[in-house]
């Protein structure tokens, strides 16, 4: 069950499971096309509909995800790869998973992790500023609360994308004790 994401997100040894199950949840519950990529010089996955695309990076950390310029730079590279779409810059051509129908200004970035700590918000602003691209961070708890909202008919795909505001997404008040 998807609830196990709460534990997997805190287990660095299960990073791949975290990627796979997170993307499966987006596909099966949020009803957004999701492709798992991962590997060298590729984001962990992409989400897309005909009108938008999201570059996804998942991080499984026991103590939460804190600001890392190296990881911001990695996301910036993915965003730039997708903008330029130049195989001589990145021969993996991972961006070809996005449909050609997506307008150039309708791409987003997303980090998913157990929790976001310390100055993580600075990583979001820095990445957005460097790429002129809107992004977000989504904790596993909010990912699950969002899924519950989707199932109840309260969270549409449009509302999901509209919640990308270069900050952490909060669909509902936390029900976990930190």
Residue ranges, per PLM feature:
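Catalytic core segments in nucleotide and nucleic-acid processing enzymes
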Residues: 1-177
